[in-house]
Design a protein with these regions (language model features):
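C-terminal motif of bacterial Sec signal peptides marking the signal peptidase cleavage site
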Residues: 12-14
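Immediate post-signal-peptide N-terminus of mature secreted/exported proteins
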Residues: 17-84
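Primarily heptad-repeat coiled-coil rod domains in cytosolic scaffolding/tethering proteins
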Residues: 22, 29, 36, 65, ...
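Long amphipathic all-alpha helical oligomerization modules
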Residues: 19, 144, 148-209
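Long amphipathic alpha-helices with heptad-repeat character
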Residues: 41-52, 81-84, 88-102, 143-150, ...
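Long amphipathic alpha-helical segments with strong coiled-coil/leucine-zipper propensity
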Residues: 49, 60-126
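Positively charged n-region of N-terminal signal peptides that target proteins for export
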Residues: 1-4
Length: 209
């Protein structure tokens, strides 16, 4: 069994090597790719924050329904929820990319330190590696905290979409009013966590220049 499990890992390692080699030909080292990945993750988080706020706006409109096309209002909320799910997937993917590039960068850095003949240069490089790794761990922690903060809100949105799908009436809409306030509090916490993550990404990018 272990022998077969090694095959995907070897294929993945080979793909990563080809990927990095292609970028190196264009003058992009892993350090540059890590900065680019962090910028992408930061951008997707900003977009996610906007999507969650838009979904909350539609939910509030739906909860304040006083006549009109109820199904149309529900469909708008459902569409915003689906946009949130899609954007959350992008955020998760970008964070996985950041983690992968960082791991590969640090492995390469460690290998290259062992190639030094000059002990002083090796020690200096080792200290810089430790500092960069420490700063990255702080960034990674905030990225994953922001990622985790999305799920409670998504679950609540999902529950409302599923419930309203089969109970689209005035009584069900009335029950949304208290839920909207609860979800707003969760979204506020989500946005605060994302803002911390975005600020940490900004600091990390500056130190990598």
């Amino acid at each position: 069994m272990k022998r077969f499990l090694l095959v995907p890992a070897l294929v993945l390692a080979s793909c990563n090597s080809v990927y990095y080699a292609a970028w190196e030909k264009l003058g992009w080292e892993k350090r540059d790719l890590l900065v680019s990945a962090v910028k992408s993750a930061r951008g997707e988080q900003k977009e996610a924050g906007e999507e969650f706020q838009d979904a909350l706006t539609q939910l509030k409109k739906l909860s304040g329904y006083h006549g009109g096309n109820l199904e149309s209002a529900y469909n708008k909320f459902k569409a915003e929820y689906e946009d949130c799910e899609a954007q959350a997937t992008k955020v998760r993917s970008e964070i996985r990319e950041v983690d992968q590039v960082a791991r590969d960068l640090f492995r390469e850095w460690e290998r290259e330190i062992r190639q030094y003949e000059n002990a002083s240069l090796a020690a200096d490089s080792r200290a810089k590696l430790a500092d960069t790794r420490s700063r990255f761990e702080q960034l990674s922690s905030t990225l994953h905290a922001a990622e985790a903060s999305m799920e409670p809100v998504l679950r609540q949105f999902r529950d409302q979409v599923l419930y309203l799908k089969h109970n689209l009436n005035a009584a069900a809409i009335g029950s949304l009013r208290g839920k909207a306030d609860t979800i707003q509090s969760d979204i506020q916490r989500l946005l605060e966590q994302m803002n911390r993550s975005i600020a940490e990404a900004d600091r990390f990018i500056q130190t990598m220049k």
